[in-house]
């Protein structure tokens, strides 16, 4: 791989990371804890433990944190709780070495990690105590640019887990997925992989495990057709902070940093506007964007009385510590223009009490150049959406994409099934994702519990690599959950009848109906045509009420609990 391309002012020649002195630290607010190797390990550990005491059980709490490690070696134990992002700030993961456990533990009794959401580990290496790293997680848990110097398990003592995401990661030993229901690994490497359950998808991974779908349920895509890795913070050997923007890559395989830094370019952090919760408003943020500034959200919740508008090409918007945008007056939280190269990363969009037409709208207004978009697409990375759970929230659509060639690299779009403000008539949401643009590519699409189509895809040449969806638990009766006469419910994944070209790999759709007599006719609904192709689909009933009658259109038998039937369709058509 070529070395990382950065602006000349970002690097000082002739210095190695072994010569790093503690750099001047930017003011990123009280909830970004910055550690350097000169600090006593006990002092670092004390701060980590204080954060975990706050965040361990704070599923719907208001606090947000980023734990930031500057290049060097550390001997600490890092438990990762809710809304906590652990970051290494080296040019490669190996520039930050943690000798000790970095772990995510199950948040429910009986080792159950199915509600272990909203936490992240990015950009460092870990040598786990005892040789094995435990990462028991479910949705909205980025694991990026990591090097595990040992083994890794994706569960806690074989308790249930519903993940998950891994990208640009090297695990020297074995990855044991165990009781994970599903997983996507993109551009990652390991010594070996063991385990499978319902839907395991591997894209651009050089050493995929042996076996073929459906037993084990492995979906293997040899190369990643097009992707841009997520922007990330970096501190160079002179102590300068920058945001690195990896280059667009095509037909890639394996991690980006084998031969040095991830290829890309850097922008000095000093040129970013640093937003602060409780201080900044939509108005103050928009004023800075209008001046041509890029934007860094520090951890916290931002109450917005208007939409944040990203209109300039190549704008970077990066959130730390699950920075959360919540519209308060029924507006869209963020709207981008149809301009090439916009990058949105690391944000949680949380619906407010007044229904929003969308939470994030991509490509609004006059159409831009499709030729330029093809060469420099808009990309979304680790963008998460929530309707309800922390309180009443309402949105018609969560993520609305108009721009052609948009890349989505990991998203969870969740209408809450538990927490505060939850009910069929309380946290209302028609659709999780609506795609109108052509040539949109999505890796790691998790969409759950919305009240009509979870996904409605109207653009042509769409591609989805991994889809996980639970349809809504809580329709009170079939009449409240019917798309058309003679059709029960709304398909989870709907490709519009006008579409002529669409393809999906590795789709799992599950039901947990709480009321008797509620069913879904088909999990996936698509038009017929030579350009419509799907690979490796499964439906599962997780509760004893209702059923999914077909997997895709009229193919696939009904789900059943007794006897257990998990219908699968290998190829469509």
What are these regions (language model features)?
Residues 18-573:
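Extracellular/periplasmic carbohydrate-active domains that bind, remodel
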């Amino acid at each position: 791989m070529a070395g990382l391309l950065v602006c000349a002012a970002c690097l000082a020649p002739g210095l190695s990371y072994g010569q790093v002195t503690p750099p001047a630290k930017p003011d990123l607010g009280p909830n970004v804890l910055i550690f350097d190797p000169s600090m006593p390990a006990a002092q670092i550990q004390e701060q980590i433990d204080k954060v975990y005491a706050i965040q361990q059980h704070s599923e719907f709490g208001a606090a947000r944190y980023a734990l930031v490690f500057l290049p060097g070696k550390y001997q600490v134990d890092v438990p990762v709780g809710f809304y906590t992002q652990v970051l290494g700030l080296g040019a490669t993961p190996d520039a930050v070495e943690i000798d000790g456990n970095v772990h995510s533990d199950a948040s429910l009794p009986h080792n159950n990690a199915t509600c272990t959401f909203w936490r992240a580990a990015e950009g460092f290496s870990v040598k786990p105590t005892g040789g094995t790293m435990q990462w028991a997680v479910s949705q909205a848990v980025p694991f990026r640019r990591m090097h595990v110097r040992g083994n890794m398990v994706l569960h806690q003592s074989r308790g249930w887990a519903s993940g998950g995401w891994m990208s640009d990661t090297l695990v020297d030993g074995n990855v044991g997925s165990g009781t994970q229901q599903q997983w996507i690994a993109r551009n990652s490497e390991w010594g070996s992989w063991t385990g499978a359950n319902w839907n395991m998808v591997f894209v651009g991974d050089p050493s995929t495990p042996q076996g073929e779908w459906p037993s084990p349920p492995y979906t293997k895509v040899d190369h990643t057709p097009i992707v841009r890795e997520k922007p990330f913070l970096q501190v160079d050997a002179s102590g300068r902070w920058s945001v690195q923007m990896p280059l667009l890559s095509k037909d890639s395989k394996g991690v980006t940093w084998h031969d040095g830094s991830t290829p890309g370019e850097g922008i000095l952090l000093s040129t970013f506007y640093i937003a602060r919760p409780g201080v900044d408003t939509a108005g103050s943020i928009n004023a800075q964007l209008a001046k041509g500034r890029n934007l860094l959200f520090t951890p916290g919740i931002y109450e917005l009385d208007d939409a944040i508008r990203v209109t300039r090409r190549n704008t970077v918007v990066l959130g730390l510590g699950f920075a959360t945008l919540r519209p308060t007056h029924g507006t869209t939280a963020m709207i981008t223009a149809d301009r090439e190269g916009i990058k949105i990363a690391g944000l949680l969009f949380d619906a407010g009490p007044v229904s929003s037409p969308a939470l994030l709208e991509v490509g609004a207004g006059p159409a831009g150049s499709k030729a330029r978009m093809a060469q420099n697409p808009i990309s979304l990375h680790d963008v998460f959406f929530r309707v309800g759970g922390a309180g009443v929230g309402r949105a018609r659509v969560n993520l609305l994409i108009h721009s052609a060639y948009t890349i989505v690299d990991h998203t969870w779009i969740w209408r809450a099934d538990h927490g505060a403000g939850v009910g069929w008539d309380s946290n209302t949401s028609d659709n999780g994702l609506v795609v109108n643009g052509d040539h949109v590519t999505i890796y790691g699409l998790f969409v759950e519990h919305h009240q009509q189509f979870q996904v409605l895809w109207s653009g042509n040449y769409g591609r989805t690599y991994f889809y996980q969806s639970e349809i809504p638990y809580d329709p009170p009766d079939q009449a409240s959950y019917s798309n058309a006469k003679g059709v029960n419910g709304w398909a989870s994944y709907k490709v519009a009848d006008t579409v002529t070209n669409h393809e999906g790999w590795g789709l799992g759709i599950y039901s947990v109906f709480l009321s008797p007599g509620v069913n879904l006719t088909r999990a996936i609904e698509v038009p017929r045509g030579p350009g419509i192709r799907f690979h490796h689909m499964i439906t599962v009933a997780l509760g004893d009420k209702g059923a999914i009658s077909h997997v895709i259109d009229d193919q696939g038998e009904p789900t059943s609990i007794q006897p257990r039937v998990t219908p699968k369709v290998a190829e469509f058509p």
